[in-house]
UniProtKB/Swiss-Prot annotation:
Entry's transmembrane regions: none
Gene3D superfamilies per record: CAP
Top-level division of the source organism's lineage: Eukaryota
Subcellular location(s) of the protein: Secreted
Species the sequence originates in: Tabanus yao (Horsefly)
InterPro entries: CAP_dom (IPR014044), CAP_sf (IPR035940), P14a_insect (IPR034763)
Major localization listed first in the record, in broad terms: secreted
Stated name of the protein: Tabinhibitin 1
Length: 255
């Protein structure tokens, strides 16, 4: 009986997620400290998109690849790898269609960092990572994803226990924003978008991923434990050091 109720709850939550995504008027959402909301108005390509801009569909295989890469890193960090402390309650990240839709709209600007809001009714302070590609030939989508992950993975040399306990974007060894966001224990979901275009003889691409939360300066990236997942209600079957996807973590509550 319990399993039936849980299944019904998850189905209802999924239906609500999609219904909310379609019904929200982003122009009316609070947008503090930003010029505009990325979800407000009709989506159109910006002048920066050069010639032949095209927003690419991220298929299930691409979405699974992104989730696998992120959860692999989270699982690795949660068990205390790279000299980092173990995570007490870091959950498996799932795909979110609304975050992906806003990420897709962001990529149509063909500029990585902007002053646009990306908050939703469910996620009040989403984080964002942008990966820009430029080359003679456009690689396959999976190769773009792999390149983006490798770039973020290099930040493991910059991040320390001190950064985990007291977050800031930069330190003596360089930027840690990307990796720190991927391993935040308040991140519960992610959604990405991809746009490609031509700029003269160059092929360019912008891959954007929106996360359900972002790290806050001076606050912990995740809560430290004496053993991996010691505070989890239930561990994930695949990622043994992470909480399951149903772990009730509030992405809007700071550590």
């Amino acid at each position: 009986m319990t399993s039936i109720l849980v299944s019904r709850f998850l189905i209802a939550a999924l239906v609500l997620q999609y219904a909310t995504s379609d019904a929200v008027n982003y122009c009316r959402l609070p947008c503090r400290g930003c010029d505009y909301h990325v979800g407000c108005g009709e989506p159109a390509y910006a002048q920066e998109c050069g010639q032949s801009p095209r927003t690419r569909e991220l298929l299930k295989e691409h979405r699974n690849e992104i989730l696998s890469k992120i959860n692999d890193v989270r699982d690795h960090v949660a068990k205390g790898s790279w000299g980092l402390p173990m995570a007490a309650r870091m959950k498996v990240v799932v795909w979110d269609a609304e975050l992906a839709g806003l990420a897709k709209r962001h990529t149509k600007g063909c500029v990585g960092e902007t002053h646009a809001c990306r908050n939703t009714e469910r996620f009040w302070l989403p984080g964002q990572l942008n990966f820009k590609y430029s080359g003679d030939k456009l690689p396959r989508i999976r190769e773009l994803i792999d390149d983006a992950v490798k770039k973020g993975h290099l930040q493991k040399h910059n991040i320390t226990r001190e950064f985990i306990e007291n977050y800031r974007e930069n330190g003596p060894n360089g930027n840690v924003k990307g990796l720190a966001l991927a391993i935040s224990d308040r991140v519960t979901a992610v959604g990405c978008g991809l746009t490609t275009w031509e700029d003269g003889a160059k092929a360019r691409a912008l891959l954007t991923c929106n996360f359900s939360s972002q790290n806050i300066r001076g606050r912990p990236v995740y809560k430290i434990g004496n053993s991996p997942g010691e505070k989890c209600i239930e561990k994930d079957e695949t990622y043994k050091n992470l909480c399951s996807a149903t772990e009730p973590i509030d992405p809007n509550k700071s550590n």
